[in-house]
Design a protein with these regions (language model features):
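N-terminal charged helix/coil linker that caps or initiates catalytic domains
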Residues: 1-50, 83, 286
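Glycine-rich phosphate/adenylate-binding loop
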Residues: 2-23, 136-140, 145-150, 165, ...
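Conserved N-terminal Rossmann-fold NAD(P)-binding element of oxidoreductases
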Residues: 51-53, 76
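Hydrophobic/small residue at the entry helix of a nucleotide-binding pocket
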Residues: 57
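Conserved S-adenosyl-L-methionine
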Residues: 67-72
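Glycine-rich phosphate-binding loop and adjoining beta1-alpha1-beta2 segment
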Residues: 75-113
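Conserved SAM/SAH-binding loop
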Residues: 121-129
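Short amphipathic alpha-helix with an adjacent loop that forms part of the alpha/beta core around
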Residues: 128-138
């Protein structure tokens, strides 16, 4: 196997180097240990999470995982930081314009959590490459992309691998972060992106066609945008969230990313089936109780 390649021969940027001796994880992440317990914090520090799409939602999810002391992160995105990203993406600054999103996010994470190993994949997920993009060592995936076909393929792969996945719905046009919901992707309403993904999962990946039948896949989503939300131009109103699509605000994109990160950690820390140990605490979404089954085996829209 060539240097800098994974088991599939796919090139990956190397994880960062050894940690500086002055780094004190117990001091830096003591609050995480008090919240999740010593055993939970140790499991987080040993876990491998994948964030697919490092933009308005994914960048905040990666930030949250790093600030919880995650052991390894794989960041997947081919995009570069643009000025239009500054309103909603944590890595978008005047000093980072034009730089690779995964590169600047990796540098930020190194400053937050030096012990976190970061693998950078400069690529977009497609139907053809998804199997080689998601590493076999992953413990959970956060899907923060907005292309329905690729999103469905990623979800289907995770389900086939019994890999927990948390799916993020559309954030464009939403203004209220407290309107976020958590449910099975089959139960999400008012989200055109997830509706399109559901249709593809049923048509292309043999997901249940019966109305109301759960997919066993968790989604974080928000109802349809307010009537005043506008796309950049007529004819673009169906776009979920892009520079030329609906307007967006960081209060919603960050909240969705944080919720996805919380659910990803809950999936990582959930006891194996048959265990009597209680799951770590987790906040419920406003107006919607947590579903009976969440991202324990896979997730997607």
């Amino acid at each position: 196997m060539a240097a800098g390649a994974d088991a599939d021969g796919r090139p990956r940027a190397p994880a960062q180097a050894a940690v500086d001796a002055s780094f004190d994880a117990s001091r830096r992440f003591g609050g995480v240990e008090r919240a999740y317990g010593a055993a939970g914090a140790a499991r987080i520090a040993a876990a491998h999470a994948v964030v697919v799409g490092v933009g308005g939602v994914g960048s905040w999810a990666a930030e949250a995982l790093a600030r919880c002391g995650i052991g390894r992160l794989t960041l997947v995105d081919l995009d570069h930081v643009a000025e239009s990203n500054v309103n909603r993406q944590v890595h978008a600054l005047g000093s980072t314009l034009g730089a690779s999103k995964v590169q600047v996010m990796a540098a930020r994470i190194a400053d937050i959590s030096p012990a976190t190993l970061v693998d950078r994949i400069d690529d977009f997920v497609t139907v053809d490459n998804v199997a080689s993009i998601v590493p076999a060592s992953a413990g959970v995936v956060i899907d923060a992309i907005d292309a329905p076909r690729a999103k469905a393929a990623l979800i289907a792969l995770c389900v086939a691998r019994r890999l927990p996945v948390v799916v993020c719905g559309a954030a464009g046009g939403r203004l209220d972060p407290l309107a976020l919901r958590r449910s099975d992707v089959a139960d999400a309403t008012g989200d055109a992106l997830l509706a399109s993904v559901r249709a593809r999962l049923r048509r292309d990946h043999a997901f249940p066609r019966q109305r109301g039948a759960p997919f066993g896949v968790e989604a974080v989503w928000s109802p349809a945008p307010a009537g005043g939300a506008r796309a950049a131009s007529p004819g673009e109103a169906g776009m979920p969230l892009a520079c030329a699509g609906y307007g967006s605000v960081v209060m919603v994109t960050a909240a969705m990313g944080f919720a996805a990160a919380a659910d990803a950690l809950a999936a990582l820390l959930r006891p194996p089936r048959g265990s009597a140990s209680p799951a770590p605490p987790r906040a419920s979404s406003r107006g919607t109780p947590p579903p009976a089954r969440a991202a324990s085996s896979a997730a997607g829209p």
